[in-house]
Amino acid sequence: MTRGARLRSDARAQLNQLSLDGGTGSGQKGKCEEFPSSLSSVSPGLEAAALLLAVTMDPLETPIKDGILYQQHVKFGKKCWRKVWALLYAGGPSGVARLESWEVRDGGLGAAGDRSAGPGRRGERRVIRLADCVSVLPADGESCPRDTGAFLLTTTERSHLLAAQHRQAWMGPICQLAFPGTGEASSGSTDAQSPKRGLVPMEENSIYSSWQEVGEFPVVVQRTEAATRCQLKGPALLVLGPDAIQLREAKGTQALYSWPYHFLRKFGSDKGVFSFEAGRRCHSGEGLFAFSTPCAPDLCRAVAGAIARQRERLPELTRPQPCPLPRATSLPSLDTPGELREMPPGPEPPTSRKMHLAEPGPQSLPLLLGPEPNDLASGLYASVCKRASGPPGNEHLYENLCVLEASPTLHGGEPEPHEGPGSRSPTTSPIYHNGQDLSWPGPANDSTLEAQYRRLLELDQVEGTGRPDPQAGFKAKLVTLLSRERRKGPAPCDRP
């Protein structure tokens, strides 16, 4: 029998005894006034019975833990610790699970002392409902009173920073009442005690995987065009091997189809369905196969991991050897880009072929070769190259009259064969002969147009014999015309 029931039974027994001994004490007002002597004899017993009834009807809750705590509060902008007497109550028919605190003052420390001291002496009462508790964690970084440990009790409304001499002795019961069903204290308190248990420190496994290397996944074949062609339907077992995916019967070990990983075009999972697209080289032929399974994401990750491992074993499939480009050194020796050589006039050997450089490219790429030019063009380019490499001469409009003349003599003193009016020389026939220096005298001599063409006429008379008279007459008229222009103004080449 509990204490409350026992007190109630004792109170009822005393009341019955009092009613039997003093029958006149019925409790009515009129009778009490008529028999005052009987009232005086019954009053002490009634007072004792009333006190027992008050105790039995309002029994005191017994806390599961009580003691001194320190609670942090802010006073005038400064954090202070207040010493309180804490009472931890469990939930029951008479109240909810809560943590009550009374400020400790002079006149009493315990709950009984505080009650007898009165409201002015026991201080303010604070209640924290454990049903509103969110977390209970140790607060090692907080400064707290000496020989105490701080812990943070967070509720839905605010956070309470408490400190106790034995922190875990308070955190454990609070967590058991605030988080029923967990069976243990919060993770923070467990972590706080883990170094004290002497556990061996462990390291994380970097290659840990939650799925098996060779997994078997029960699936249901979805209806697709490829599945209908292969006559696949109903439940089956999808087995992931090191090199291929096998489809087996649901209640047997016979393999129905096999799809090598390197023959799969695509694969993926979406909303509980794993699907892949097989290539033409698969035994089932090309097409889309779909399988419904609750572990479709795990199946997709397993296939991706198997493909990655197979790629590591066969690096030559993913790393093709680069084909080196042919270098310019592997070709026949050519002239330096941008430089042309002058070929002496005369027939070329039939075995030698002259290559023409179209456009120089980078040194690491093969040179681009153009078509073989004709003899006239090669002589023209050679003449231009020679004139560009020498000192610049006077350029003017009338130097092109040399085209009408025959080619001068060669370096060896032998005259070149004369050209016919409608024929070309079989050898190189440059516009300006390379063997004759057409540069005029230096600045000390006369460099006017009239003097230059007179010099040209003298050379024609000395070197050329048998010239047609029309050309000589034409040149004479031209010299006369130029002399007239000279009198009118400076020649175009003399203008700045």
From Swiss-Prot:
Residues 18-38, 313-363, 408-447 are annotated as: Disordered. It is a peripheral membrane protein. The modification Phosphotyrosine is found at residue 381. It is found in: Cytoplasm; Cell membrane. InterPro entries: Docking_Protein_DOK (IPR050996), Dok1/2/3_PTB (IPR037751), IRS_PTB (IPR002404), PH-like_dom_sf (IPR011993), PH_domain (IPR001849). Residues 63-179 form the PH domain. The modification Phosphoserine is found at residues 194, 330, 364, 425. One of its GO terms (cellular component) is cytoplasm. Keywords: Cell membrane, Cytoplasm, Membrane, Phosphoprotein. The keyword Cell inner membrane does not apply. PROSITE patterns: IRS_PTB. Residues 213-317 form the IRS-type PTB domain. It comes from the Eukaryota. Constitutively tyrosine-phosphorylated. PTB domain mediates receptor interaction. On tyrosine phosphorylation, interacts with CSK and INPP5D/SHIP1 via their SH2 domains. Both Tyr-381 and Tyr-398 are required for interaction with INPP5D. Only Tyr-381 is required for interaction with CSK. Binds ABL1 through the PTB domain and in a kinase-dependent manner. Does not interact with RasGAP. PANTHER family: DOCKING PROTEIN 3, DOCKING PROTEIN RELATED. DOK proteins are enzymatically inert adaptor or scaffolding proteins. They provide a docking platform for the assembly of multimolecular signaling complexes. DOK3 is a negative regulator of JNK signaling in B-cells through interaction with INPP5D/SHIP1. May modulate ABL1 function. This is Docking protein 3.
